[in-house]
């Protein structure tokens, strides 16, 4: 299987190194050489500090502890958000399998009104929720206009506050 596998990853999300512009590839040598040749002609090299920091992130025990702690923290936020949304009338939410987002079906609220404006689709839902201080991303941007995307890549306190505001918004829909 190894000869048929290509893995491409980066340091941004796993190691909180956004902006460092470091990625890596694991692949059979012929593919790695071709990718390396293409990459050398399309991008400049990453700075040496970012390269050394990435090696340290990938090889240090301290880094592994950081990742474990971060995973636990995100899992706590995910569980709270999923439980809260699944208990909210009118929202259908499958269990998220990756990243730090949930994709909630809110179409049960379409046709209702907030401050005299009708919720017609995910974009109008997002725009009206924003008036209540809740930022969501319309699902239409991801191919499902019945849904909204919410992030739990924020503090647990902010997750709780955002969900409280979302529930207040939903309660005001008539």
Where are these regions (language model features)?
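PLP-dependent class I/II
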Residues: 1-174
